[in-house]
Structure formats: structure tokens, C-alpha cells
Amino acid sequence: CMPLQYIAGKMVVVRSLIAGLKLIPVAPCGHPLKELKEAPTFAAMIPMQVYNSLQVPEEKHLLKHIKHLIIGGGAIDTSLGNELKDFPNHVWSTYGMTETLSHIALRRLNGKEASDWYTPFENVRIRLSEENTLIIHAPNVCAEELTTNDIAEINEEGKFRILGRKDNTINSGGVKIQIEQVETTLRKHLSIPIQITAAPDAKFGEIVVLLYNKVEDEKEIKAVCEEKLPPYWQPKRYLPVEQLPLTGTGKPDRATARRIARGE
């Protein structure tokens, strides 16, 4: 159910060939379990597909009975993570990119082993750059170290968590604001999808802008922002849109969001 032009889709095929699994082809869509009669042993999905499947009882039943479910291609917000905590089988969030041939680390989302920290594979080494971005050494897939744009934290056990992306930092009046941290905070209190982006401003240099689907109540969103966010994180503008911009793999399309905020 992943597009084959992306590494995530290609690696599903590779895994099935290496493990001798029966590959069940499903056209990439928002409801990959819709036509299935029984749960697969293994599945790889993006958060949007998992979220959609949870809204349909028949699909949710199948989702719960996938023995090994990996979720990648985007952040898993608090509400989605909470819905997966009680799943009976193995549910994982993955971390990786095209350059690493899919994921190089996993974190468990359910059961006693659930964690906020990613565990790198045995042959993968990680460290932080001077800018606190994650550096990956995965010699089996890449001869040289790979410096990412992901701002990370590494604990004493060698596990890591992602705080945001270097290129997703808003500099507003000299205060650096990480887009993902604002979104994560709001998702704990809002059940509706939103996106945070930036727009140029003569006074502050950049301002925080919140995009939301136009059918939602702006007053409710604004009230949550004013109550739950620090003053310098609070959006200066709220923009209703027909649809929040997403990439082909279901990630927030940050470039398009910025263009919308700039009125382009």
C-alpha cells in the first residue's frame, strides 16, 4: 500500500522476497485494509493510513490483528499513539530515509516495551553534530556518515528521539521556535488536524502561522493556543484552508504550507 517510487514501497517488496512472504498488492490509498478479508502478517503504513483505518470498525479489527505493523513517513501524534497502546501484537514507529534504504531504528508503540526513544539497529552508530542534528553511520548501506537535518537527543543508553527538523525552525523576534514542538503540544489538546508554518513579518522577521481545515471552529483553536502555548509560540495568524498540504507519502508538505502562509 506504499507507492513504489518511494523507498518505503520498494523495501516492502524486498522484505517479502527475502523472507519468502506472500506479497499482497494494494494500490496506495488512504484505506489500505478496505478490500482485505483477513489481516496480513506484516504491514507498513504511514500515520494517515493508520488513522483512517481506525475510523472504520472493520478496518480497525484487521489493523489490530496485524502481527507486525510498522509505521513511518511521518510523526505519530499523541492521540494516534494512545489508540495503538492496547493493540495485542507488535506495533512500531520507524526512523529512516531514502539514503539509509528505509529505517535504521525502531521504537515500540504498544505493550510493556512502548517508548518515546528509538533504538538503532545493532550495526548502526549515531551521534550529534554541533547543531544537535543526528549523524548516522550505517556501514551496511552507506560508506560515509550521513548528517541529517533532524534535531535530536541521545540518552545514555544510546537511544534517540527526534525534536524537530533544522529547516523547520521559525526565528521570530530572535526566538527560535521548533514547528514540530508547537504541533505536538497542540495535538495533545486538539482532536483536529492542524499545521504550523511561518510567514515573513516586518517587525519580527517571521511569525507563527496556523493552518486548519476551513470547516473547523477557529475560536476553539485559538482558545487552546492561548491557554496551552507559551506567548512566543502562539500563532499571530490563523489561516483556514480547503485541505492541509501533504506530500505523496502523507507527510506535512512544509514548502507548500509556507507558500500558503505567504499568500502565494
Pin down the residues of each PLM region.
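Structural motif
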Residues: 42-44, 70, 211
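AMP-binding/adenylate-forming core of the ANL superfamily
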Residues: 125-147, 151-153, 159, 213
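AMP-binding/adenylate-forming catalytic core of the ANL superfamily
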Residues: 151-233
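AMP-binding/adenylate-forming
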Residues: 1-52
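Active-site glycine-centered loops adjacent to acidic/histidine catalytic or metal-binding residues
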Residues: 46, 73, 96, 150, ...
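Conserved C-terminal "lid"/linker of ANL adenylate-forming enzymes
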Residues: 197, 209-211, 224-264
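Gly/Ser/Thr-rich phosphate-binding loop
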Residues: 56-111
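Conserved acidic residues
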Residues: 41-42, 67, 150
